[in-house]
Amino acid sequence: MLLLLPAFAASAGERLSCPDLAAAVQVGNCPGEAELRYTFDGFCSDNRRIYQHDAALCADYEEYRKAKNVAQWESADGAFSAYVSCDATPARLHLARAVRIAVSRQGQISRVACDYGEGLVFAHRSRLQCRVEGDGDCQDGRRRCVASCD
């Protein structure tokens, strides 16, 4: 049964720090322009009534492209991941520094979110109960940008 748990699952009593994005790696591929056009036509066709909550995406191809032109990135250890715009340069991403850490809970899953500004958020999910140590402000360095999971 333990084999089914992800390798990056937080262990009891673990402290999580926001990752240094200098070592982050892209693990998913960016969609090509042809793929984006194809999925826009399919997603926003007459079947869009199924996706009424996403109807705003279908008003303009550029809005759709902005939302869907993303690739998955992971921290060096694979513990945190994010969907990052393919229009963002890797060099800019690697220079980003965490500004805030927050924990939210949905059902039995805790989500530790490290905010790097400009909509860039790397997240870690765990079944453990997680909480932010301190006020969650990371501006003064990583030592204050920590969450504990028990």
Q: What is the role of each PLM region?
A:
Residues 6-9:
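N-terminal signal peptide c-region/cleavage motif recognized by signal peptidases
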Residues 13-150:
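Mitochondrial intermembrane space
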